[in-house]
Curated annotation (Swiss-Prot):
Propeptide residues per the UniProt entry: 129-157
InterPro entries in UniProt: Bulb-type_lectin_dom, Bulb-type_lectin_dom_sf
Domain Bulb-type lectin: 24-132
Gene Ontology terms: biological process: defense response; regulation of defense response to virus; response to virus
Protein name: Mannose-specific lectin
Higher taxonomy: Eukaryota, Viridiplantae, Streptophyta, Embryophyta, Tracheophyta
Biotech relevance: Can be used as a chimeric variant with insecticidal venom toxins to obtain biological insecticide candidates. This lectin has receptors on insect midgut and this allows its internalization into insects hemolymph. In an other hand, scorpion and spiders toxins are naturally not toxic when administered orally to insect larvae, but a fusion with this lectin makes them toxic for the larvae that would eat them.
Taxonomic source organism: Galanthus nivalis (Common snowdrop)
Function of the molecule: Mannose-specific lectin which binds alpha-D-linked mannose. Displays a high affinity for alpha-(1-3)-mannose oligomers. Displays antiviral activity and therefore may contribute to defense against infections.
Length: 157
């Protein structure tokens, strides 16, 4: 009994002192990226630039951007609790949004290993920059499971 209480207390304590963002490629609901801050995964970087442009880079090549550069300076990116990803200027006025706001909940913006940036809670928005076939079965469905929910089997030609 004492050991169980000690384990519960340790878990609570660790939860309190552990940073909320344990991964370099995830932005959680309520978190922000200030100027110069970024998400990264391998050679991919999703950065809030000084000129207020939010840009996805593959090494040093820009792949996607909000095209908000020059509209202000020192902006920040917010992953809102309603699922909307928004770039705000220093006066807290939105200058770009993913337009994915809906119900309040727990959402994450993830820079994935396929280079795509996706908002999850329910898939609400993506940059569309993925490099591979993600979410598509590697082999045909088995007879036991002839369909995989809403996933359609796609074969390469």
């Amino acid at each position: 009994m004492a050991k169980a209480s000690l384990l519960i207390l340790a878990a609570i304590f660790l939860g309190v002192i552990t940073p909320s963002c344990l991964s370099d490629n995830i932005l959680y609901s309520g978190e922000t990226l200030s100027t110069g801050e970024f998400l990264n995964y391998g050679s991919f970087v999703f950065i809030m630039q000084e000129d207020c442009n939010l840009v996805l880079y593959d090494v040093d090549k820009p792949i996607w951007a909000t095209n908000t550069g020059g509209l202000s300076r020192s902006c920040f990116l917010s992953m809102q609790t309603d699922g909307n990803l928004v770039v705000y200027n220093p006066s807290n006025k939105p200058i770009w949004a993913s337009n994915t706001g809906g119900q309040n909940g727990n959402y994450v913006c993830i820079l994935q290993k396929d280079r795509n940036v996706v908002i999850y809670g329910t898939d609400r928005w993506a940059t569309g920059t993925h490099t591979g076939l993600v979410g598509i079965p590697a082999s045909p469905p088995s007879e036991k499971y002839p369909t995989a929910g809403k996933i359609k089997l796609v074969t390469a030609k």
